[in-house]
C-alpha cells in the first residue's frame, strides 16, 4: 500500500480490447499507486472486467481522439502526480523505486521522462531508433494537459523536465501480424492527417520515402545490430511509410481512405 506521508499518484490508461496485456500493466503499479483509472472506448474482449477485478476504476466512453481521451482520464484523477501508461507497458522495479523517491522527497520538476525498452517479435531492441526512446509520462496533475495528434498524444506544460534512468518495459509488437496491423493503422491515420493539412503525394514520393525509412532504420540507426528483428523492423517501417504516402495519394484521387485507422494510443 502507498505510504501516507508521501505525495499521491494516479495511473491513467486509455484502452480498447486489451485483455491480453492490461492485467500485467495494472499489476505492475497497483501495489504502490493510489488510484488506477482506465478509460475504455468499447472493449468486447473482457478488458473492463479484468480492470475492475484488479481494483481499477473503469469508465466506458466514445472515442474522441488520443489527446481528449487522455484528458478525460486526467480529469478524473485527484492526486498530486499522474503516470500515463499504455496497456502493453510495465513499470520495472527499478523505475518504480525512482518514482517513489520523487513522491517521497518532492520535486521542482513538472514532468519526468524515462527511457522505454521496447520489444519487436520477442526481441528488446537496442538500436533501430527504438532505444532509448525517452518518453514523458510522469507529471504533476494540475500543470499538464494532453494535445491530440494522429497516432500519438503529447504533453503540454510549462516547467522543467527531470529524467529517470530506469526504463518502462514495452511489449510493443509481439509478432508479424501485429507489425502488419500497426503499419496499416498508422499509415491510415498519418495519411488522413496529411490530407487534412492539404499535403499531397505521388507514387515516386511513396517509393522514395519508403526506401529512406528502410535506410534510416537499418543503416543510420544501426538496425543491423538488432539481428533478424532489426531487418524485419526496417522493412515494416518502410512498408508503413510507403503505404502512408500511397493512401494520401488515393485520398486525393478518390476522396476516401483505404485501410483502417487505429483506435488506441501506441507511443
PLM feature spans:
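N-proximal low-complexity "stem/linker" segments adjacent to membrane-targeting elements
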Residues: 1-28
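Acidic helix N-cap motif at the loop->helix transition within catalytic regions
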Residues: 23, 45-54, 94-95
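A conserved acidic beta->alpha catalytic loop
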Residues: 28, 32, 40-52, 86
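Conserved beta-strand segments of alpha/beta enzyme cores
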Residues: 35, 57, 160-162
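Conserved donor nucleotide-binding strand/loop of the catalytic core
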Residues: 48-76
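Catalytic metal- and UDP-sugar-binding loop of GT-A-like glycosyltransferases, i.e.
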Residues: 61, 85-87
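Catalytic-site signature of metal-activated, phosphate-bearing donor transferases
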Residues: 67-74, 80-85, 92-255
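Conserved small/polar residues in nucleotide/adenosyl-binding loops
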Residues: 261-267
Amino acid at each position: 500500500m502507498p505510504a501516507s506521508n508521501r505525495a499521491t499518484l494516479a495511473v491513467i490508461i486509455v484502452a480498447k480490447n486489451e485483455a491480453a496485456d492490461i492485467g500485467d500493466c495494472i499489476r505492475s503499479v497497483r501495489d504502490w499507486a493510489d488510484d488506477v483509472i482506465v478509460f475504455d472506448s468499447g472493449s468486447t474482449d473482457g478488458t473492463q472486467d479484468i480492470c475492475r477485478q484488479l481494483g481499477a476504476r473503469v469508465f466506458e466512453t466514445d472515442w474522441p481522439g488520443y489527446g481528449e481521451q487522455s484528458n478525460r482520464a486526467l480529469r478524473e484523477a485527484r492526486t498530486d502526480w499522474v503516470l500515463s501508461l499504455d496497456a502493453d507497458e510495465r513499470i520495472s522495479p527499478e523505475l518504480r523505486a525512482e518514482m517513489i523517491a520523487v513522491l517521497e522527497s518532492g520535486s521542482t520538476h513538472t514532468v519526468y521522462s524515462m527511457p522505454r525498452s521496447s520489444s519487436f517479435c520477442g526481441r528488446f531492441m537496442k538500436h533501430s531508433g527504438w532505444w532509448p526512446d525517452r518518453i514523458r509520462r510522469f507529471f504533476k496533475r494540475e500543470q499538464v494537459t494532453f494535445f491530440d495528434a494522429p497516432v500519438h498524444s503529447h504533453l503540454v506544460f510549462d516547467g522543467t523536465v527531470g529524467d529517470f534512468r530506469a526504463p518502462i518495459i514495452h511489449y510493443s509488437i509481439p509478432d508479424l501480424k501485429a507489425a502488419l496491423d500497426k503499419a496499416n493503422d498508422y499509415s491510415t491515420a498519418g495519411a488522413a492527417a496529411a490530407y487534412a493539412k492539404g499535403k499531397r503525394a505521388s507514387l515516386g514520393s511513396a517509393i522514395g520515402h519508403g526506401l529512406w525509412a528502410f535506410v534510416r532504420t537499418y543503416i543510420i540507426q544501426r538496425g543491423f545490430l538488432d539481428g533478424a528483428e532489426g531487418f524485419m523492423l526496417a522493412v515494416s517501417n518502410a512498408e508503413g511509410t510507403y503505404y502512408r504516402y500511397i493512401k494520401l495519394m488515393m485520398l486525393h484521387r478518390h476522396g476516401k481512405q483505404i485501410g483502417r485507422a487505429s483506435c488506441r494510443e501506441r507511443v
